[in-house]
A protein has these predicted regions:
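N-terminal nucleophile
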Residues: 1-252
C-alpha cells in the first residue's frame, strides 16, 4: 500500500455551487488517486495510506441523504485502517469535514472552515495548513479554481511536503457527470508552478471547449465556431500558447 504524504483542500463555491479539490504530494500522478468528486453530491481528497473506497463511501453516504460530517463518521467507522487514513470532504450544501488518523506520518493535521477543509500529512509543520486556509479565505471574490490554486501555492510557499515535490492536481465539478476542469502536473520538479501554467492555458483553450460539450439536459452538438477555429490552430498559436508546432515534413 502506498502512503501519499500530501496537502490538499476541498471546497464548495457559495456563489456557483461548484465543488473542487486541489492536492499536491511527492508521489507521481496524485490526480489519479486522491481527488474524488460527484455532481450534486460532494468532493473529497483521500490521502496518507490511501483508501479510494473511503472517499467513495463518503460520497455514497452524502448521496443517500447524510451531510458530510455524518457520511464521514459512518465511512471511517467501517474502515479498519482508519488510524492510517486522512481525508477531507465537502458536500453540495457546503458542509465540510476532515479526518486524520493517529498513525498518519507527522506533521499531520487539518482545518475545517466555512465550505472548505484543508488537510495534510508528512508536512514541515502546521504552517502549511494555516497558510492554505488563509489563502482560501482571503480570496473570496475569486472563482473556485483560482481560490484552490492560491491555496496550493500558499501551502507550497510555506514548506509543504517535507520530502520534496512531484505532482499536483486540481479538479472542479459542476452539475454534469464530467468535471468542468481536471488539470494535473503528474511528474515535475516544481509541480505547483507547472499546474499554474497548465491551468492558465486550460482556461483559454480547454474550458471553452468543455463549455460547449453536451449537457445532460441539452442535445449533442459541435463546439462553437470560434472554439473550433481556435483548436484548429497549432497549440503555440492559440491563446495562452503551449504545446508544439507540427513537425516539418522531411523529404526522402
Amino acid at each position: 500500500m502506498q502512503e501519499f504524504n500530501t496537502f490538499s483542500i476541498v471546497a464548495r463555491c457559495p456563489r456557483t455551487g461548484l465543488l473542487g479539490v486541489a492536492v499536491a504530494t511527492a508521489v507521481p500522478a496524485v490526480g489519479s488517486t486522491c481527488p474524488f468528486s460527484r455532481p450534486g453530491v460532494g468532493a473529497a481528497s483521500t490521502q496518507s495510506w490511501v483508501n479510494p473506497y473511503l472517499a467513495i463511501a463518503v460520497l455514497d453516504g452524502i448521496a443517500s441523504g447524510k451531510n458530510a460530517v455524518q457520511a464521514l463518521d459512518a465511512a471511517i467507522a467501517a474502515d479498519h485502517g482508519r488510524s492510517l487514513r486522512q481525508i477531507g470532504v465537502v458536500d453540495h450544501n457546503g458542509v465540510a469535514a476532515a479526518w486524520s488518523g493517529s498513525d498518519c506520518t507527522p506533521w499531520f493535521g487539518q482545518e475545517v472552515g466555512d465550505g472548505f477543509a484543508v488537510q495534510g500529512n508528512m508536512l514541515v509543520g502546521p504552517e502549511t495548513i494555516a497558510a492554505m486556509s488563509r489563502a482560501f479565505r482571503d480570496s473570496e471574490s475569486c472563482d473556485l479554481d483560482e481560490r484552490l490554486m492560491l491555496a496550493l501555492e500558499a501551502g507550497d510557499a510555506s514548506g509543504g511536503d517535507k520530502r520534496g515535490k512531484q505532482s499536483a492536481a486540481l479538479r472542479i465539478q459542476g452539475s454534469e457527470a464530467y468535471p468542468v476542469l481536471d488539470v494535473r502536473a503528474d511528474e515535475h520538479p516544481e509541480p505547483i508552478p507547472e499546474l499554474r501554467r497548465i491551468l492558465t492555458i486550460s482556461r483559454l483553450q480547454l474550458i471553452p471547449f468543455v463549455a460547449g460539450m453536451p449537457k445532460h439536459d441539452g442535445p449533442a452538438g459541435a463546439a462553437p465556431a470560434e472554439v473550433q477555429t481556435m483548436l484548429a490552430l497549432p497549440p503555440p498559436l492559440r491563446p495562452g500558447g503551449g504545446g508544439s508546432l507540427p513537425a516539418k515534413n522531411v523529404s526522402s
